[in-house]
Amino acid sequence: MKLKMKFSAIAVALTVLITPAFADAVFTLGNNPQPNEQNVLFTSNQTGSTVFGFTNQSNTQTQFSSTTDTLVVTSNGQAKVTAMDGLVNDITFSVPGHTFLDFILNPFKPANNNDLTITVTMSDGSTSSFGPYGSTNGNNFLTITTINNEAIASVTIDSAGGFQDLRQPRVSGISGVVPEPSSLLLLGSGVLGFATVLRRKRSR
C-alpha cells in the first residue's frame, strides 16, 4: 500500500514538472512590458468586423477582428477598440503576415466578474487558454509571453457578458520587422567603427 502511494506521489510530481514544458504561452496578470514593446495606435476612424492599427515604432499593421461584434475605433485619444452595441463579446488580435512573441491586453470593465477567457493560437496551430478571469472594477491587464522558441499567431478574447472596450494593446517580437531608424543608425556606427579599426591594423 505504501509503495503504491509512493508511485502515485512520484507520478503527480512528474506531471507537475512536465506540464509547463508543453505550455508554449505564458500568462502573467498585470502590465509587464517586454523588450522593444510597441503601442498599437489607430490613425483613422473605423467601423466594421475588422479594423486596423499600426505599431508606434516600426509602423507595422495590426488587425482586430470579431465574429460577433461591429468594432469601432477612433484616431483621437487613448488607443482602444469598442463595439457598436457598447459591449465587446469577441475580439481577435493578429499581425497580418507576421507572428509575435508578446502581447499585453486590457479588456476594460467587463459586465460580469470572471467572464474573460483568452485563447492564444501559436504559429504551429496549437492553442493555449487562460481564464475565466476579470473584474468589473476596471483594468484587467494580462501579459502573454512565449517559451520553447514558439511564436504567437493570434490572441482571442471572449466574454459572454461583454466588456466595455479593449484598451492600451501592446505587442513585441514581431517577426521580420526591420529595426527602427535609431537602432539602424547605432548599428551602422558600430560597423563603421569596426571597419576603421581593421583599416588601422592593416596599415600597420
What are these regions (language model features)?
Residues 1-10:
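Bacterial N-terminal signal peptides that target proteins for export
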Residues 24-176:
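Surface-exposed, well-ordered secondary-structure segments
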Residues 10-17:
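Bacterial N-terminal signal peptides
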Residues 179-198:
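A short, hydrophobic C-terminal helix/tail in secreted or cell-surface proteins
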